[in-house]
UniProtKB/Swiss-Prot annotation:
InterPro entries: DUF16 (IPR002862). It comes from the Bacteria. It comes from Mycoplasma pneumoniae (strain ATCC 29342 / M129 / Subtype 1). Belongs to the UPF0134 family. Disulfide bonds: none annotated. Gene3D superfamilies: 6.10.250.40. This is UPF0134 protein MPN_501. The lineage of its organism: Bacteria, Bacillati, Mycoplasmatota, Mycoplasmoidales, Mycoplasmoidaceae. Pfam families: DUF16.
Length: 196
């Protein structure tokens, strides 16, 4: 990472110019810590006050103090971001665990639903069997109804015959009564004849 550092006096600047052997330079040099090299840019401002360079207006460079303040504020921001990211990571872990638990619950509910589906299928089969049994019973009931009708018709015929027989019996009883009357008369005649 390159760090921008100001010259604190002209001698330091000229020493750096001699080391790098480049033309005229600004009052800033950049140290590349990775390559151990020094770079310059722009024009050198020779106005030094209290061993600090005068930064030209509209310059893109800052003082070491400003740079350190900026760096510190960035470090604080990075720390806050890291803290926030860590908290968000924990929240993500908790959410992941919650999602996994919900996934397990969903799997359990799916199994319950499948079991209910199987039970419903069994109940449907039972209802279908009962429906078939009801149809068979209805057929048997119809057959029994027809048999009962035949029996009732037979009984009705027998009842009609019995009625006819009763009528005949009544007629026979009437005839028997008449015959008894005749028999009584005959007995009386016989008695009369015997008494003579």
């Amino acid at each position: 990472m390159k760090e921008k550092i100001p010259f604190y006096n002209e001698k330091e600047f000229h020493d750096m110019v001699k080391k790098t052997k480049k033309g005229t330079f600004s009052g800033w040099y950049i140290i590349d810590k990775d390559n151990n090299s020094v770079e310059f840019s722009g024009k050198f401002n020779r106005q030094f006050k209290l061993n600090k360079p005068v930064i030209p207006v509209n310059t893109e460079y800052v003082t070491r103090k400003e740079f350190n303040e900026y760096k510190n504020s960035n470090d604080q921001r990075l720390t806050k971001i890291e803290t926030t990211l860590a908290a968000q990571g924990e929240q993500i872990n908790k959410l992941t665990q919650t999602v996994e638990k919900q996934g397990e619950q969903i799997n359990q509910l799916v199994q319950v639903v499948l079991l209910h589906g199987e039970q419903i299928n069994k109940l449907t089969q039972t209802v279908e069997k009962q429906g078939e049994q009801i149809k068979e019973l209805q057929i048997e009931q119809k057959a029994q109804g027809e048999t009962l009708k035949l029996i009732l018709q037979t009984l009705q015929k027998m009842s009609d015959r019995l009625d006819k027989m009763e009528v005949k019996m009544d007629k026979m009883e009437v005839k028997m009564d008449k015959m008894e009357v005749k028999m009584d008369k005959m007995e009386k005649r016989i008695d009369k004849l015997e008494s003579k």
